[in-house]
Amino acid sequence: MLSIARKIFGTVNDRKLKPLQARVNRINALEPIMEALSDQSLKGKTAEFRKRLADGATLDSLLEEAFAVVREAAKRVNNMRHFDVQLMGGMILHSGAIAEMRTGEGKTLVATLAAYLNALEGKGVHVITVNDYLARRDADWMGRIYGALGMSTGVIVHGVSDEQRKAGYAADITYGTNNEFGFDYLRDNMKYSLDQMAQRGHHYAIVDEVDSILIDEARTPLIISGPTDDRSELYMAVDALIPRLEDSDFELDEKQRSVVFTETGSEKMEEWLTEAGVLEGSLWEPSNISLVHHSNQALRAHKLYARDKDYIVKDDSVMLIDEFSGRMMEGRRLSEGLHQAIEAKERVDIKPENQTLASITFQNYFRLYKKLAGMTGTALTEASEFADIYKLEVVDLPTNRPVRRLDEDDVVYRTAKAKYNEIIKEVRAANAKAQPILLGTASIEKSELLSHLLTAQRIPHKVLNARHHEQEAFIVAEAGVPGAVTVATNMAGRGTDIQLGGNFDMRLENERAAKEKALGRELSEGETSLLGAQIRADIEVKKKQALDAGGLYVLGTERHESRRIDNQLRGRTGRQGDPGKSKFYISIEDDLMRIFAADRMDAVMRRLGIKEDEGITHPWMNKAMETSQKKIEERNFEIRKNVLKYDDVINDQRKAIFEQRMEFLRSDDVSDVIEEMRESVIEALVARTMPEKAYAEQWDITGLEESLKTDLALDLPVREWAAEEGVANEEIAGRIREAVEGQYAELTRLIGEPQMRRIEKQFLLQVLDMRWREHLQQIDQLRSVIHLRSYGQRDPLNEFKREAFNLFDTLLGELRATVTRSLMHIRVQQAPQQQPQQVAPPPRPQPPQPAPQPPQQIRETKLDPDTGVNEMNPADKTQPPGPALHQAEDDWTNTPRNSACPCGSGKKYKHCHGAIETQKA
């Protein structure tokens, strides 16, 4: 019935696409008009569109004409014409949705349509890719189209300078990787002046391989951190004990990827740690809780993380591997000491643990964009998650030509040995007829095992995994050559097309570079054209050979946890209507089968009389495998949702801090904020030592006097005031407030108001950053133990929200107290006239390194009194300061608000330097 209804009414997806066809027809009708325009007139369309926008037109009203302009520019500069389905893809991207497009359907070209249209607003468009190579390639390749239309293109990749980053983000359209965009956001929120910031907002983003970035990497937070104390000896001492454990000493759950000590295991660790001289007393005493943490991380390092699967060892370092793409994740480190535990296990240099300085998850970073869109070949399996988390709709686009790929049923073997033997036979048979083969594996370990087996059989092949990622693009580009055998870890997000016969652009680039190197000069335009013609002719011959052999044969050597990864592997063949074939070879010893279905599957195969070297193919097997994958996907979805619930708590706090910080950066005068902080500190101090309903005899006068000295640098006769007949705490608070404001006004006069405003701003930003980092560390610690609240029948999430709020409230209180204390302890001394002035506020806690330092270091600033140039950094030009500051115990007269202002203006203090509007929090 359902199929009949779909034929009559069409699917939901069909109904989404139907209205787009009318717009495609109108774009096609504009093609002759655009073809008649000169290059200059075509470029002039951009200025025309922008004027129409300024006059009240909308982007949607310009869409058809703008798309026609982009199509014409692509034809002229790149010899590429957008197909009708690609125009539809551009409309879907512009609407803020995800376009599902098969491999080879030209996603890179589709992005130019929506990117150009949205860049007309002048607020910047970000096109996000999965690696630096693709970002550079696409920026160069598609940048020609934008350049022909008068738009600028920027690229943000690892290693570019701050100036290059600023220029890249200032461009109309910016290409870059998800990591760099996220880290730049965090870096910008650690800068000390607006002109140092790189990004200019989050207007519109197009995410390529959107499922890889927003789903697979959603659980991975971006963290900027600084090193803490070296504990390498402790890591080594604990690591040496783990191999002595027996299986009964821990419980391992491979499905949940968790491992914990049993009671006997804990007792053994306690005994061994004591013998090693590391532990004093019981392991479970509060003072030894860090040893419990180290022991747990060492156990995880040994039992959950495998070399050449989860990480590799390269250049005396442990490099993590992306489980979905098989790539090395350079610069990424596991947190909470787990990375150090793995380094101890592998006996490599143990790098210090890091303290979090700033962090954000991809989920929350990409939700910053006012409009978000994405492209991928495999999003439908995760459509509900895109809708739930990101409010993104997935629209499945038809292919430009019918798919001719043959997807065969899985073949299941009882042993891995039998599976690999059959794979080698299949490769040999396909290779004999020059059919190109792509062998997909789930880990480096498996890819190197397969490579070893192929080498033993003298079958020439190339290996693509995290060890050889530098040659990635070239290896993938040549995988469609007749007779090519390519072994690759997960092909997710590779980004380079596998074209039958070879990739023309890649070959031309490489062969031209080789010829120029041999000749010692650049090839002329004619020589380059001749070389291109020769390569194109050779590719056509090889393409025919590959087609005659049946097209690219994708052979999966095991199923991945995610159906999307398997679908992406299949999608590498059958591009643009080419023939192709895909097939998976599986054994019940594979990780996925062993964890989820091994016993049941083995029993069935035994009952059927299947021998170890025989395979079985049946739709039931496919169904069982799909069920296992769905279970894992559902579990991972729940984990990601749970991560987001917790991260949303800290995200609200992060947004509040970052927004407040940005306000401080934009303001040249934060004296209102500083005065409000002083008021809050005084109120809190009086409330603590002189409670409202307490009798005068119950007041803590000694505590108040000491706090006034330490927090506000004031020595006031509070005891005498308290002894006065009928004096109330409000009156004493008023006298304290008057004394504080008077002293601060005098400091401002002596230092000079412009200089004081700069000092206030620098102190405020530095203390805010320092307290925020400490807060993040506390939040990390809270999150690592909050699950234990469930044992007390309390909801960990609600407990986390409550505790995090209390910590945030404490952060704000400490911020006010620290800023006020630091500023009130500044003392002024007249320096000899002939000497330069010095500004040196009291020592303050330094943020961990490498933390971004402010452009003007308040400590040890040496200013030329005539020019205002900082002699320690001549580029830092400020206004000449007032008298130099130093830490002394001088007594200074107070300036009551109704007294004459010490600056000599003749006005009352409250109407001059004290004219600050009090704001209550």
Swiss-Prot record:
Gene3D superfamilies: 3.10.450.50, Helical scaffold and wing domains of SecA (1.10.3060.10), P-loop containing nucleotide triphosphate hydrolases (3.40.50.300), SecA, preprotein cross-linking domain (3.90.1440.10). It catalyses: ATP + H2O + cellular proteinSide 1 = ADP + phosphate + cellular proteinSide 2. Zn(2+) binds at C901, C903, C912, H913. Transmembrane segments: none annotated. It is an enzyme of class 7 (translocase). PANTHER family: CHLOROPLAST PROTEIN-TRANSPORTING ATPASE (PTHR30612:SF0), SECA INNER MEMBRANE COMPONENT OF SEC PROTEIN SECRETION SYSTEM (PTHR30612). Its cofactor is Zn(2+). ATP binds at Q86, G104, E105, G106, K107, T108, D497. NCBIfam families: PRK12904.1, secA. PROSITE patterns: SECA, SECA_MOTOR_DEAD. SUPFAM superfamilies: Helical scaffold and wing domains of SecA, P-loop containing nucleoside triphosphate hydrolases, Pre-protein crosslinking domain of SecA. The gene is secA. It comes from the Bacteria. It comes from Hyphomonas neptunium (strain ATCC 15444). GO terms for cellular component: cell envelope Sec protein transport complex; cytosol; plasma membrane. This is Protein translocase subunit SecA. May bind 1 zinc ion per subunit. Residues 829-838 have a biased composition (Low complexity). Belongs to the SecA family.
